[in-house]
Amino acid sequence: VCSSDLLVLGERTSEDVKLALASAWPLREEMYAEVRGRDLVTGLPKTVVTSTIEVREAIEEPVAAIADAVKVTLDNTPPELAADIMERGIMLAGGGALLAGLPQRLHNETGMPVMVAPDPLYAVALGSGQTLEDFDVLKDVLFSSAHD
């Protein structure tokens, strides 16, 4: 639902709008696009123009949750690892890493360098595969108890 115009969007349209206009940080040049959906009041098809600003406001809650999760994780990170992260930065992977402006947003909230992994859509799978290959070397790290 596009709340300012009470427009109901289909799943595919929502995904298209997200890919075209979503950002976690203000862009140098804001963009606009026509969006077609169903008017919630009349039930009739309707076309509205929306912007990256409106879409950014619409996704603010999940983006803030991502930023909060990163900060909580950093707060719970052992000091030695935190120092390494401060030096090397945060590496984003997965589909969310492709959200425009997410590195800038996380840098602004953490003060740390933030980068997107090469080929972020496959980085998680590749890293999981590498972990399985190196399991004997990594098992003590992977299964260290928080209660030690």
List where the protein language model places each region.
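Flexible, glycine/charged-enriched surface loops at secondary-structure junctions
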Residues: 7-14, 76-85
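Glycine-rich phosphate-binding loops at beta-strand->alpha-helix junctions
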Residues: 22, 26, 82-106
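Adenine-nucleotide phosphate-binding core of ATP-dependent small-molecule kinases
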Residues: 29, 33-82, 121-124
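Conserved phosphate-binding/catalytic loops in two-lobed NTP-binding clefts
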Residues: 104-130, 138, 145-146
